[in-house]
Curated annotation (Swiss-Prot):
GO MF entry, a single one: structural constituent of cuticle
Keywords: Cuticle, Repeat
Domain remark in the UniProt entry: The tetrapeptide (A-A-P-[AV]) repeats found throughout the protein are also present in many proteins constituting the protective envelope of other species.
Role description: Component of the cuticle of the larva of Tenebrio molitor.
Pfam families per UniProt: Chitin_bind_4 (PF00379)
UniProt entry tagged with the keyword RNA-binding: no
Native source species: Tenebrio molitor
Signal peptide (UniProt feature, chain positions): none
Protein name: Larval cuticle protein A1A
Domain Chitin-binding type R&R residue range list: 84-150
């Protein structure tokens, strides 16, 4: 192949040529570099790989077969059902310190509930509610109001205000 060398620059002395202006002696300032001839290589060598070859190959391991999960039979337990449910409860509160007075009683036999409750309203009357509930008639309540027996008001004893006599001063002299 051909290998080109870089071009070279040569300078020549400059002289005044009279009415023709300035100019250089001789030829051009730029000259081509000589062409060098280089022989092409006859063969190329492949690079040497410096990697060790594996000593042996192993087959992939065999996976164990997995069985499907075993179905477990579940027994269904039915909720207990009482065709004739029964209950009864009650309470009574009589608090002399706070004046709280209330009570309630209730009972159930099958689908029928009966009961009552009472309390003292802020105006001093006792309210009593009697109720029943069943699938045919629904919930029904009857309200009774009755005044409480007023407590006898005991008058506080009157305290007489007596002024103490003035102390004896022994008279007044002129």
């Amino acid at each position: 192949g051909l290998v080109g060398a870089p071009a070279t620059l040569s300078t020549a002395p400059i002289a005044y040529g009279g009415y023709g202006g300035y100019g250089a002696y001789g030829g051009s300032l730029l000259r081509a570099a000589p062409i060098a001839r280089v022989a092409s290589p006859l063969a190329y060598a492949a690079p040497v790989a410096r990697v060790a070859a594996p000593l042996a190959y192993a087959a992939p391991y065999a996976r164990a077969a997995v069985a499907a999960p075993v179905a477990v039979a579940k027994t269904v337990v039915a909720d207990e059902y009482d065709p004739n449910p029964q209950y009864s409860f009650g309470y009574d509160v009589q608090d002399g310190l706070t004046g709280d007075s209330k009570n309630q009683v209730e009972s159930r036999s099958g689908d029928v509930v009966q009961g009552s409750y009472s309390l003292v309203d802020p105006d001093g009357t006792r309210r009593t509610v009697e109720y029943t509930a069943d699938p045919i008639n629904g919930f029904n309540a009857v309200v009774h109001r009755e005044p409480l027996v007023a407590k006898a008001v005991v008058a506080a004893p009157a305290i007489a205000k007596v002024h103490a006599p003035l102390a004896y001063s022994g008279g007044y002299l002129h």
